[in-house]
């Protein structure tokens, strides 16, 4: 009967949760918001890639009239952010991770006194955080901090800006 088939499929799906899951897909929110995918390459190493839109207040350094000027501004960015991570399982489903990666995408400089300027964005970042993997459900929750450096390039104005690029984020992912 249909009930037996559904029950059997449900039992198989739940039993799959008892084996090691190497893939996680979900959402990341905070300093940027979007989709997150994590692939365990071995017991302790993973690649995590986020495709996200972010908004942040940052400091920007630029060269004006032969002197270095530091200013603060708002950035709206759309990036892909792959990271290589070392994962260490602690106890009771809690794990810690650290690593680094890069970000590539577009950034929109938003300033009250000027029109928005679009930049190509290229950066490097560190990543440190902790997570919790549920024992009975195929879900993980994580918090992380990603300090970094970004170059913002604008061809029209022949400008290169340097920015402190940071994100604090929370994520939830489905494991499979």
Regions found by a protein language model. Give the residues of each.
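Positively charged n-region of N-terminal signal peptides that target proteins for export
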Residues: 1-5
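Gram-negative (and chloroplast) outer-membrane scaffold detector with strong preference
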Residues: 39-143
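Outer-membrane beta-barrel pore domains and translocons
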Residues: 30-32, 52-54, 101-105, 144-150, ...
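Repetitive helical segments and hydrophobic/amphipathic motifs
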Residues: 12-13
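Outer-membrane beta-barrel "beta-signal"
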Residues: 164-176
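A generic structural motif
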Residues: 7, 32, 42-44
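Sec/Tat signal peptide C-region and signal peptidase I cleavage site
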Residues: 6, 16-22
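Solvent-exposed loop/turn segments connecting transmembrane beta-strands
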Residues: 22-36, 74-75, 92, 152-163
